[in-house]
């Protein structure tokens, strides 16, 4: 089973695909979609095209998306919600369903502490998947963490 984890962002959207087979999790691919244009419509199209390419290249059975973190800038939250809505629609179209998890849920599931720092989450991701190299930017480790949490929720791992 392949699980796609997504950490949506307004400039970088982290993604990771993990595999569950023979009672073991492994990382298939991870990276980020870099959003460079400044026009909202183009940003959304770039994001959706990149997600389409990812879904064309890899077979995905389950998708988990990190829920929006409500910051202090309402304009940023609205923009992020628009990106997330576009991602959700594309995932429903291509995969059929997705699950959502808050940052607090993901941090608690991986570290035991819902207020853990991103670096602590990255440490646990590396430990659980036996990754020896550094994971940068942290959007990538967040996406991997979302996928791992989803595997835990499905009682796969």
Swiss-Prot record:
Protein function: The RuvA-RuvB-RuvC complex processes Holliday junction (HJ) DNA during genetic recombination and DNA repair. Endonuclease that resolves HJ intermediates. Cleaves cruciform DNA by making single-stranded nicks across the HJ at symmetrical positions within the homologous arms, yielding a 5'-phosphate and a 3'-hydroxyl group; requires a central core of homology in the junction. The consensus cleavage sequence is 5'-(A/T)TT(C/G)-3'. Cleavage occurs on the 3'-side of the TT dinucleotide at the point of strand exchange.
Signal peptide feature range: none
Record's keyword terms, sorted: Cytoplasm, DNA damage, DNA recombination, DNA repair, DNA-binding, Endonuclease, Hydrolase, Magnesium, Metal-binding, Nuclease
Keyword Lipoprotein: no
Enzyme category, top tier: hydrolase
Cross-referenced Pfam families: RuvC
Gene Ontology CC entries for this record: cytoplasm; Holliday junction resolvase complex
Catalytic activity as recorded in UniProt: Endonucleolytic cleavage at a junction such as a reciprocal single-stranded crossover between two homologous DNA duplexes (Holliday junction)
EC number of this enzyme: 3.1.21.10
Species annotation: Helicobacter acinonychis (strain Sheeba)
Family membership: Belongs to the RuvC family.
Keyword match S-adenosyl-L-methionine: no
Residues bound to Mg(2+) 2: 66
GO MF annotation: an example: DNA binding
CDD domains: RuvC (cd16962)
Main subcellular location: cytoplasm
UniProt name for this protein: Crossover junction endodeoxyribonuclease RuvC
Subunit structure: Homodimer which binds Holliday junction (HJ) DNA. The HJ becomes 2-fold symmetrical on binding to RuvC with unstacked arms; it has a different conformation from HJ DNA in complex with RuvA. In the full resolvosome a probable DNA-RuvA(4)-RuvB(12)-RuvC(2) complex forms which resolves the HJ.
Cofactor: Mg(2+)
């Amino acid at each position: 089973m392949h699980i796609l984890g997504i950490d949506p962002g307004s400039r970088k959207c982290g993604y990771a695909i993990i595999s569950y087979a023979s009672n073991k999790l492994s990382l298939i691919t991870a990276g980020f979609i870099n959003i460079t244009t400044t026009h909202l419509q183009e940003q959304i199209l770039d994001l959706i095209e990149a997600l389409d390419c990812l879904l064309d290249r890899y077979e995905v059975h389950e998708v988990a998306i990190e829920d929006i973190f409500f910051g202090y800038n309402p304009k940023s939250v609205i923009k992020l919600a628009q990106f997330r809505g576009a991602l959700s629609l594309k995932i429903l179209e291509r995969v059929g369903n997705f699950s959502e998890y808050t940052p607090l849920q993901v941090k608690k599931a991986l570290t035991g502490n819902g207020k853990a720092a991103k670096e602590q989450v990255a440490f646990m991701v590396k430990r659980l998947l036996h990754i020896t190299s550094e994971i940068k930017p942290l959007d990538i480790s967040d996406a991997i963490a979302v996928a791992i949490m989803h595997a835990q929720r499905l009682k796969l791992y």
